[in-house]
Amino acid sequence: ADPELPVAIGGYAMIPLPQYADVVMENGAGRYFDIFNVHAYRAIRDYPAIMENVRSYMERHGIADRPLWFTENGTDSEGSGRVSSVIAGMKAHSPEQELLVSEILPKVMITMQSFGVDRDFFFVLPPYNERNGNKDWGLMRRDFTVKPGFVVFSTLTDRLGSAVYLGAMELGDGIRGFLYRQPDGSQTLVYWSVTGIETESNRPDRDFKDLYRRGFTLDVKDGVYTGCNAFGTPFEVKAADGKLKLEATRLPAFLSGLSGLTPAVPFRAVAKRGASADGFDRTIVF
């Protein structure tokens, strides 16, 4: 084994973190891992409280300087599968539920990044059922064709995979915006309309009928700007007289080639390290 590889503690799957997690740290586990690891399957509106609980725990046990990973992050916001699958006894997402997941995935990941989460792993890529076959997980169907959420995940990675998060923008009522800096110094704005996915608890009857179209304006230099929607379809928009008119929907869009924008809520990145090299013998023999 490579002693230089970072070590993540086994993921805690209960939020709020149970007393057991405190006992683990009281027995010296903090010397043996570099990355704190959590699982979460909650509505987006619950994530501020989740982060408060996790951050409080990390502060309490002197590990606030460790990277924070969510190695499982899934959702019940679309409810149990509504249609039959190709396997008897297994339910599958309806087309509407697939679109709901394609909305949830990028909103969760970008929101978590804005909270300072270092890595977020969506659950799960392959087709997978639980709860007596009623809960359909996975960004692939049983025939291994991809769902819309897979495509949106691909767009998210393509547009922001090498970017640095700068902070949140104020774009108007019912609209969220997040600003990123690309390796070439240009800026990318991600924006979307707020829906019940973000403000309500999980509901089994949620639908995708309303796109929640909302207009807003950016103060930018005149010229033509390019971007794409959540599925990677490109678009062009033209700014005139220092104004750029845009429309947000419930699915995120990505606007590229920006410059000079300042986030209303700047992100303050904190340097993080693993377990300190304190001379303690942390050799583990299996």
Language-model regions, residue ranges each:
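Noncatalytic carbohydrate-binding groove/subsite architecture in carbohydrate-active enzymes
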Residues: 1-109, 115-117
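Aromatic/acidic polysaccharide-binding cleft in carbohydrate-active enzymes
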Residues: 75-154, 167-175, 183
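Surface beta-strand/loop "capping" patches
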Residues: 159-190, 267-286
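Carbohydrate-binding surface patches
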Residues: 170-221
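Extracellular ectodomain segments of secreted/surface proteins
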Residues: 198, 202-211, 261-285
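Solvent-exposed beta-hairpin/edge-strand motifs
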Residues: 217-234
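C-terminal beta-strand-rich structural cap/linker in extracellular carbohydrate-active enzymes
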Residues: 236-274
